[in-house]
Amino acid sequence: MKKIISIFLLVSVVFAAKDTLSFVAVGDIMMGLNYPEDAPALPPQDGKLTFADVQDVLRNADITMGNLEGVLLDSGGSAKQCSNPSVCYVFRMPERYVNHLVDAGFDLMSVANNHSGDFGEAGRKGSVKALTEAGLGFAGFEGTAETYSLEKDGVRYGFAAFAPNTGTVRFHDTEKSKRLISELRKKSDIVIVSMHIGAEGTGSSRVTRKTENFVGENRGNPYEFARIAIDAGADMVFGHGPHVPRAIDLYKGKFIAYSLGNFATNASVNISGISGYAPIVKIKTDSKGNFLEGEIISAIQKGEKGERRPFLDPTGACIEKIKQLTEADIPETELFIDKSGKITLKK
């Protein structure tokens, strides 16, 4: 009888623990370049140190996600051509680098962005192959990997990712976006949405609540789409694309990060000033995805081209910046950020 009671109590504790769920989200990840072949930018020790200083944080959540900014492909593919070469970048990473993501603790990757098609169909297939073989969840490719579902510790998670780019699930198709999220809602306990949206660069850290354009492209309205996603059934929305941090927000009890900036961009991405800020956002929700509390963990990228990686930042620069942006752009938000990075509901 004592043994039966002990087992019952153990099971009860396990299920009680899932009343609170934790999520970690970070920004753009590009771990090193194997293109062009005559001038690669690969990190020391073949990238094994990429997440060394932050992996304890990344591993400490029920679900950890990021944005894979580029393709996983060892060779080949046709590099994209741009009408304006001065703002044209192509990112191709060795397929084996997917193991660094697994080792760091990632569960989900968005492939909905403007670099997931840098090497055409060959690049997309390479990414799908590498991520699938590594057991990493991913979403955002039109027609082939539009959404992703997984069950972990008895909780069913649904993941969808959107961008404005060809080959991705495009947020411009509002009805399709809503349908995909709604379908996930029906079969998931928690629905997570990634949006690659908004203008880019150091001058694009503000949430304008308007449609944003960059190099002639309609990059969408982050404020509006986050609400569309939540109304359709999302429990949290994480933004990528601007390459700088933006404000955070709460809508109908669901958490929004409008942009998480750059996280681990080894080469070819500007990391000066706020472009080098690499915030790690950790939130806790109840079993229905309603926000309970959170934390901004400050990190910053350091190193020369080919050696860059994120380091924890004791100065709290990310915290201060996101707090400032949130107070300026979303003054009505229900969220309060204290100086240590703790995110709570306003009293």
Give the location of each predicted region.
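Short, intrinsically disordered low-complexity segments
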Residues: 1-2, 17
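Sec-dependent N-terminal signal peptides
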Residues: 3-13
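Acidic, metal/ion-coordinating pockets
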Residues: 17-347
